[in-house]
């Protein structure tokens, strides 16, 4: 028997996991314990953080539309992902996926992180653009590792206040 099973109908898999591809879960990993983190992420989903991935990330917008806010050279840029689009994001490009459409689905493929290689999560000031907070983590599980980091940032006025201009980051997207 093959470790990851035999081929399966991916559209049917998405339909069967649709209840996990919307808030509050929003994503589902296709295979466990592989060399790749293969995830389907659904909408609606709005994020206020920017991910600093040490490796490339592959996006394939299967259903609906989404976009990525990118933080490049001190300013925010936008990359649209229309249904059917694929995109390869280079390593260390800060990005914040935005999935405003209910029922949307995006295949995201990332490399597993070797020991000692960390991911960064950053929040920027809406008023002046300076970095408000950065946290690094040895990412083992997207589902288990990220919520405590995000909750700590959202719960702390100290972490959310911009040291440069004093503006308060609004916290969690609504």
Curated annotation (Swiss-Prot):
The keyword Lyase does not apply. Binds 2 Fe(2+) ions per subunit. Transmembrane segments: none annotated. One of its GO terms (biological process) is anthranilate metabolic process. Substrate binds at residues 57, 99, 110. Keywords: Dioxygenase, Iron, Metal-binding, Oxidoreductase, Pyridine nucleotide biosynthesis. Its EC number is 1.13.11.6. Pathway: Cofactor biosynthesis; NAD(+) biosynthesis; quinolinate from L-kynurenine: step 3/3. GO terms for molecular function: 3-hydroxyanthranilate 3,4-dioxygenase activity; ferrous iron binding. O2 binds at residue 47. The keyword Iron applies. Its cofactor is Fe(2+). It comes from the Bacteria. InterPro entries: 3hydroanth_dOase, RmlC-like_jellyroll, RmlC_Cupin_sf. SUPFAM superfamilies: RmlC-like cupins. Pfam families: 3-HAO. It catalyses: 3-hydroxyanthranilate + O2 = (2Z,4Z)-2-amino-3-carboxymuconate 6-semialdehyde. Fe cation 2 binds at residues 125, 128, 162, 165. Fe cation 1 binds at residues 51, 57, 95. Gene3D superfamilies: Jelly Rolls. Homodimer. Belongs to the 3-HAO family. PANTHER family: 3-HYDROXYANTHRANILATE 3,4-DIOXYGENASE (PTHR15497:SF1). Catalyzes the oxidative ring opening of 3-hydroxyanthranilate to 2-amino-3-carboxymuconate semialdehyde, which spontaneously cyclizes to quinolinate. This is 3-hydroxyanthranilate 3,4-dioxygenase.
